[in-house]
């Protein structure tokens, strides 16, 4: 039959690229699960009363090339002025070797958070290097492997200060008046929910205030002044006040370490180490503290441990501090952080080394000295005598200066009374400085760079002698070896080869949605039109961003059934927090601020109770019935018991048990009946899009994990993005921002992230995904995700019972395999199965969540039937191996499962096991074999012998 031109143009071509199984494979799987079609399968599984009659109107699909051209036209509306605004954001030079071999490499950006250390040694090493950078620059004992941004790190420092404070009756937190305004904004937001009073004053007046448990100082103030706080910190410590210091990572290369001055906590943004501004993110924050406070620290900590053979290996240490274990008692609600950006900063430090970093920092400071000398020579006054890279220049004709700057396509900081701020960076050249002279002094200034350079080189006093660093940094071999591009390329490749990412195999992690991150979606994030904008640039310079964000928000509104979307939260956990704050402030606006009880099902993800606690709520757990559903009787009882104090319920849909609960609307009605709000966790939106929606179901607010459902990659543990959708009555209570007015958002609330639109530069990924898929493709993606999960469940249920099912024995987009009966019979655990899967070339499913002793499998729509069958075959082969143990062929203490994973050296080592080397290392054949580089890690050893800096030199010899 002759095809029409429309058919030949095939605007939906990307749908077939994104969805793994082709039409024939889909039909084979439908036959296997006993369904006629995708629509029939969906109709059986999803409750009829929540099925959408028509799909959301987000437009027709577009080809990759058409979507890229459309987005390029939008991006071109952004104006790339040279930015000297500073305030924690500067232009950078990302080394091309890192750009090409990491940021643009799916071997790095498609990996998951390193919960399975045996398949994560590469990025764990890069993260450990970052911790070493942090330790060297801050002068403290313990560092984490990144937080979300500098402002949220400040809020975490405040919370940590209260946890470790010996002044238990003190409830006030002091913030120096020259911290960045966005930092103060986020601190105030967090303090309100914790019930802390925030005092803002000149740092030298801190001792005038009583009942202070913690202090936040900024080493280089927001307008550029370098502070020597040594004496003040000493006095504060004598009064048992916990001292946190915000620091600039590039300035720390030259300045004395705050830890050496007595600071308890030091944090800051790592953006200057090679990560583009990206209109606000994503960027990683560094965070360090004294050793005595290590168990109170937020975020991931990478530690050195041993594997089963006694070899050095790396792992995430002290996980009992974290939300997935301690729930509402966790130190923080952080789940995914900023691993990809952290590793860019880490490798930036490796590539430049101490000599290169000092050269960059000294060049920035020299150019700042030259600029200062020239301006002062011509009669302009600087507000601060001591500075690193930022000048606060007093000007008489401020409007004229700003007009000349705009004409020259330059952005200066303009919010300082009777002055302008100028922050230089590693991209600044002598030509840029001459241009700044012209803007500030006029074209006939008569200044000469070389003459000024000679003057300042011999007589620079802009950094106090006491503030100059006098110790060596980055002495470890890893920072002193890989300085040629060849060496660097090979080092990065050696790290990548140690890890298992989506470019090698399916990652079937339940509740994580490890779907395709298509190349066409990733390409725009490195376009300079998106990468080079400062988050506080004038809005007329960001019209492309505003258009893209507005379109994406409109699509998300239609897909979620909500009335508005706020893009600020820069992780799922931050989205939860922002959504709960909206609920809290809504109740307060109705004089019902006493409503503080949050109902959470027993099956909930650990971030839910941790976020509720952060939002100042009391957590009350609702039971689940034997089928894994919310127990309506218990829900009614708990809601009635809470009464006028009921704030909300946090519920995930489909549930974390992998089923569409039939009574979800009734759950919403019960909570609304008692005056509460419904927070629907968006973690499982991949089983809703195009089929149903949170707003249609009856929820009031949700966060959306754009790094799950909408294709932003996990990056080995971040970046994430967690925008919130809200019904109209909650829209006035979403996060605002103290520096930038967010267009279309009528809110007076404080910020939850440093930048107004969170990690804005990765939003094009989700824009591209929705644009290329269209309404038709998005619905089909959800349907195939459901089909793939049911196909796995149907083929594995005889070997591994599926713990929870819905109507007709179906599951949603994921399924829980119950390992507990096997463990009772044979002694083989879910951990043994997870590690044995590595030998078969797979990342393990989610272990022991939401039920201990289980494996939760989520295949997503992107995996073909071929890959699904490969996984199923591996699981069935493992079941046969378990039967061998059960039959006594292999002893429980010595078999391929308990000894897994096996490494390459075992092929030639002494062999005394009752199974062959071939069974050990080639259970699935030799083709495309993934080799882990370490055996199973000793978690107990790692936590008992905590070591969180680079391993000794001998390991590199």
From Swiss-Prot:
Catalytic activity, EC: 1.4.4.2
A Pfam family reported for this protein in Swiss-Prot or TrEMBL: GDC-P
Gene: gcvP
Positions bearing N6-(pyridoxal phosphate)lysine: 708
GO molecular function: glycine binding; glycine dehydrogenase (decarboxylating) activity; pyridoxal phosphate binding
Keyword S-adenosyl-L-methionine attributed: no
SUPFAM superfamilies, alphabetized: PLP-dependent transferases
Lineage, broadest ranks: Bacteria, Pseudomonadati, Pseudomonadota, Gammaproteobacteria, Enterobacterales
Gene3D superfamilies: Aspartate Aminotransferase, domain 1 (3.90.1150.10), Type I PLP-dependent aspartate aminotransferase-like (Major domain) (3.40.640.10)
Family according to the record: Belongs to the GcvP family.
Known role: The glycine cleavage system catalyzes the degradation of glycine. The P protein binds the alpha-amino group of glycine through its pyridoxal phosphate cofactor; CO(2) is released and the remaining methylamine moiety is then transferred to the lipoamide cofactor of the H protein.
Cofactor: pyridoxal 5'-phosphate
Quaternary data: The glycine cleavage system is composed of four proteins: P, T, L and H.
Name this protein carries in UniProt: Glycine dehydrogenase (decarboxylating)
Reaction it catalyzes: N(6)-[(R)-lipoyl]-L-lysyl-[glycine-cleavage complex H protein] + glycine + H(+) = N(6)-[(R)-S(8)-aminomethyldihydrolipoyl]-L-lysyl-[glycine-cleavage complex H protein] + CO2
Native source species: Escherichia coli O1:K1 / APEC
A Gene Ontology cellular-component term: glycine cleavage complex
Keyword Oxidoreductase: yes
Superkingdom classification of source: Bacteria
Keywords annotated in UniProt: Oxidoreductase, Pyridoxal phosphate
GO biological process, one term: glycine decarboxylation via glycine cleavage system
Enzyme class, broadest EC rank: oxidoreductase
